[in-house]
């Protein structure tokens, strides 16, 4: 017999479903075209469920980036393995697979950038979140270089900017010209950055 969820578990599940629906709707329609009604319907709830979990559409939008950046911060040790093992590693990232698997999120990430570029208040909110993520990445990279007994080619504080720029730039080009991306170019460029 299936045990009933507690009130707290139910709230967590509802919030997760709303965030998942928000990810789909915002990436499909864009921030400005997406509606709270559409997000609620996608999640199988009423609009009231959205407002009992988020103060506004913007709050839900920003909660999506917070959720993802928290996950990404936990995954940065994978970069350390890539640094240590090099391109021959079985742990080597596959940029094309990653970009295709994460297409919905990547579209949403671009929507975040557009949202921030259109309004100064929004820009400051996204900038603060990106700064936190870069800080975590910088700390992980510094620890990695120390552990490996190596010195980076670029100042540590420049590496998160460079790594993000490399990934976002190649991602944009890949979505427009998927067959044009040279095999392994992202991995080689990342390896060079992390020498």
Residue ranges and their predicted role:
Residues 74-81, 100-107, 120-147, 188:
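Amphipathic alpha-helical packing segments from all-alpha helical-bundle domains
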Residues 1-29, 33-45, 58-59:
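Basic, helix-initiating cap at the start of DNA-binding domains
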Residues 63, 74-105, 156-163:
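Hydrophobic alpha-helical connector segments
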Residues 11, 19, 65, 69, ...:
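Amphipathic, non-transmembrane alpha-helical scaffold segments
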Residues 55-59, 63, 100, 104, ...:
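Residues in soluble alpha-helical coiled-coils and helical-bundle/repeat scaffolds
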